[in-house]
Each structure stands twice: as structure tokens, then as C-alpha cells.
Swiss-Prot record:
Gene3D superfamilies cross-referenced by the UniProt entry: Umud Fragment, subunit A
Protein encoded by which gene: IMP1A
The keyword Nucleotide-binding is assigned to this record: no
Protein name as catalogued: Mitochondrial ATP-independent inner membrane protease subunit 1a
Assembly, per entry: Heterodimer of 2 subunits, IMP1A/B and IMP12.
The family this protein is said to belong to: Belongs to the peptidase S26 family. IMP1 subfamily.
EC number: 3.4.21.-
Length: 168
């Protein structure tokens, strides 16, 4: 009987070791996925009227990279993912129209009239706007956005397939 118990113990130990190794591999893979998604490249579903006609109202899936803004490689015209200054839990997709030191003149409210406002983008900030001026809450409403709120740069649209390609 003692031999049987020891043989079961050895068998259990081998099975437990194999299970632990498999769980370890899965955990490492999940960590790699998280790091890739958070710090390198990810897909993001974006929707709403603010980026019409560049992005669809009903939604697009875009591929966004998360390295450029960390190395100061964001430029005028880039479409970026930004944490909303009004609600940091929310992400917004906008186009960069001004970098630090730029002076911009824009229509205060395009629905009301031609009154224009001029602003200087301060150091460490960018000016973002939606492509649809009539349906976008952007820097015209909350001012220049700190560079630290930029989460990524949109590379291309991957869904729907008929619109696959660059966002320029």
C-alpha cells in the first residue's frame, strides 16, 4: 500500500509541475499581449460625428501605435487618440492642428458667425480639433491639450474592409 501512495504522489507531482509550466507559459503570453496592446500597438473602435468625413459615424476600427508620442514624433495633421481633458476615463480621436509655439486663429462658433479667436499653443501642449467643425468638442472648447494626454497615433483604418487604409 505504501508503494502505491508514493507512486500516486510522484504522479501527482509530475502532473502539478506540468500544469504549473503550462500556466506559466499562458501568463507570460498574456503579459506580452498586454504590453504590446498598451505600449506598442493596438486596435481601437472609434465612433461619433466629430471626425466625419475621415471616420464613419457608426464606427471604424483603427490601428494605433503608442510609441511616436513618447519620442516626440507627433506632427501637424496626425490623427491621435487623446484622453479627454473633461473626462479622463474617455478617449477621443482628433487631428492635431497646432504644436507648442504655434499661433492659431479659429472660428469661435462656426454655427453662430464669423467671430474668430487667436490662441498661442503653450509649451508641452497641442491643439486638437475634429474634422467636423460643427459636431466636435475639442480644443476650441477646452483649450490646448497637455502632451501627456496623448495615448497614441492612428496609423490606419482596418475595419470596415472597404475603407482599409491611411487616415490622411
Amino acid at each position: 500500500m505504501r508503494m502505491t501512495f508514493l507512486s500516486y504522489l510522484k504522479q501527482w507531482r509530475g502532473t502539478a509541475k506540468e500544469a504549473f509550466e503550462n500556466v506559466s507559459i499562458v501568463a507570460k503570453f498574456l503579459c506580452l499581449l498586454h504590453v504590446t496592446d498598451r505600449y506598442i500597438i493596438s486596435t481601437t473602435h472609434v465612433h461619433g460625428p466629430s471626425m466625419l468625413p475621415t471616420l464613419n459615424l457608426t464606427g471604424d476600427v483603427i490601428l494605433a501605435e503608442h510609441l511616436s508620442h513618447r519620442f516626440g514624433k507627433i506632427g501637424l495633421g496626425d490623427v491621435v487618440l487623446v484622453r479627454s481633458p473633461r473626462d479622463p476615463k474617455r478617449m477621443v480621436t482628433k487631428r492635431i492642428l497646432g504644436l507648442e509655439g504655434d499661433r492659431l486663429t479659429f472660428s469661435a462658433d462656426p454655427l453662430v458667425g464669423d467671430a474668430s479667436v487667436s490662441v498661442l499653443v503653450p509649451k508641452g501642449h497641442v491643439w486638437i480639433q475634429g474634422d467636423n467643425l460643427y459636431a466636435s468638442t475639442d480644443s476650441r472648447h477646452f483649450g490646448p491639450v497637455p502632451y501627456s494626454l496623448i495615448e497614441g497615433k492612428a496609423l490606419l483604418r482596418v475595419w470596415p474592409p472597404e475603407y482599409f487604409g491611411s487616415l490622411r
